[in-house]
Amino acid sequence: MSSYPNTKIYNTLPKILRHRAETIPNTVALRDKDLGIWNEITWKHYNDQVSYLALSLVKRGFKTGDVIGLIGDNKPSWLFFELAAQAVGGMSLGIYRDTLDEEVGYLIDAAKVNFVYAEDQEQVDKILTINRPKGNKINIYYEDSRGLKELEDPNITDMLDLISEGKEIASKHPDKYNKMIDKVSADQEAILCTTSGTTSNPKLAMLPGGKFIEHVLRYLKVDPKNINDEYVSVLPFPWIMEQTYGVGFNIVGGMKVNFPERPDTAMDDLREVGPTFMLGAPRLWEQIAADMRSRILDAPKITQWLFNVMVERGLKAVDQGKRDFLADKLLFSSLKDRLGFSKVTSAATGGSAIGPETFKFFLAMGIPLRQLYGQTELMGAYTLQDVPEGTMDCETVGVPFPDCEIKIIDPDPNGLGEIITKHPSMFSGYYNNPKAYKETIKKGWMHTGDAGYFDDQGRLNVLDRVNDIAIKSDGVKFSPQNIENKLKFSPYVGEAVVIGAEKPYLTAIICIRFSIVSKLAEKWQLAFTSYTGLAADKKIYALIEEEISKVNEQLPDNIKIAKFLLLFKELEADDGELTRTKKVRRSVINSRYKDIIKDLYLDKDTASIDTEFTLEDGRKSKISATMEIRHLIDTKTSKTTKAKSKANKSSKGKK
């Protein structure tokens, strides 16, 4: 802890930033890749940019308590504006860059935003669609000037002009910025962070700057970071965990943050950096694992055989809390090097549950991946796995951080109940929504809505949302998410929705991982022109059937998947089926695809849908499709169907 700034003195992020600029001015704080070149940003330059923007924003009317909206890719400019707002005593509201126009408008209006950093023309255009009363214009600041330079709008300004303006103010009033940030207290709300929004529109959690710092320090006690650590920022800044690492661990811990040139170059750029720490949501880890397994499809058969044998050896060793020397020598060490993970000493996954097979795969590779658990309202994670050498834990999210308390309320006979929690650095409320705060915080405890239990070692196991824990018609409880995560370990399964609440058996709606399945289809010389056509192909059905059968072998007889179908489209956040953090909105799926779900529980071989629904942006969409229902288990006898073995044979050896 002694290497971290004294937060009793430096109790806001801008104050800590200034302290670093004064004590280690020429040390690299950030790197940003542009046109193939990594540009280094020192602590002094970082602090200068923030101070110039803050002074300019004040001149333009930004004041204590105001909110600045931020939308774009992860870039240093985002951080400059975020810290500038906090320097004034204002708040930042991060918006996911793929958010639709109408969603952007909802968030901007909900937070009463009058100032916005929009990275480029695409994001500026979204802000311009927001209708505001005459004379109440939104001030927009951009970084990428392409397509914007010729605009003659006094409310749209290049951020370079703000920096120049602020620099001039600083030259005339050298103490103005320091006096400004010294007035801002630790209790001042600094960040507006959106909740996940799985059941409704996201709420805006208000995070005081001082409490955010307190919790970052709490985290650093269990997972220390310093100026020698390297991190690549690939997850969106609006997510609380990227705020923790990309902002908190950077400024408070000193960890260097590297920004890829573009989202689609992130993995290549990561290899160049060689990070010491990696954070990924489960979907990222699933995609990396799937990509590695798919690449082997193009390799000679002997290489494919070696890959599969070594992976199996590695996974068996992990189950015993060990590493397999031969598998590491022949496979995993080269995989780590190819991914850019050779220097990783700490890695984490959070945001939702990760499938145990995916988790074990990275442990077998030698990546010290650990699960964490938390909520936006509690400043992010407050548990982290601590796995002693020679043991293995792929089920729990570990134990609470110091000063964090967790209880299970209303437990069933097996100890499963709702998780409630509290710690000293919680959020101060939901912006302009006191009713929601009272519903969430009761007697100081946050009711998470998650279902979990403690194991005999006091480790927390999170199963699913309380409302999503399902009970079959025979009274058997199961977690759809747990089964879905097992399915998504397959490189061919992009998304899965398991159904079975109040039903006699389980079924699944599957979305294929098009990027990988299409590659396999080309190898098999299958004719297709679209996702829909490929998802209807019988050979692809046979492929997915084989993958589901592997998962069924791991499941108890009373919760095996009896039937499945391949959905004619991918689930999309823009269609309201996923959140912006890619979590399934089950209520939307159950409503939109109710006809399909009904057919899955009838004695039918096809499911049909013919309906119209409203998209997130208000547009109407008409759906008309018929899909094959594949039977894995005879629902009358509970025996595996003969069709399965035939299908599996037909899928093997196809070229």
Regions found by a protein language model. Name each.
Residues 99-129, 213-232, 263-277, 338:
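Conserved ATP-dependent adenylate/AMP-binding module captured primarily in the ANL superfamily
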Residues 40-44, 182, 190-214:
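Conserved AMP-binding A3 loop
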Residues 47, 51-52, 186, 205-226, ...:
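Conserved structural elements of the adenylate-forming
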Residues 25-28, 157, 164-194, 201, ...:
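Conserved pre-ATP/AMP-binding loop-to-beta segment of ANL
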Residues 407, 414-472:
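Conserved ATP-binding/catalytic segment of the ANL
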Residues 30-83, 100-105, 158-163, 207-210:
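Conserved AMP-binding/adenylate-forming core of the ANL superfamily
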Residues 258, 337, 343-349, 354-417, ...:
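Conserved ATP-binding loop and adjacent catalytic segment of the adenylate-forming AMP-binding
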Residues 213-230, 237-332, 343, 368:
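Conserved AMP-binding/adenylation subdomain of ANL enzymes
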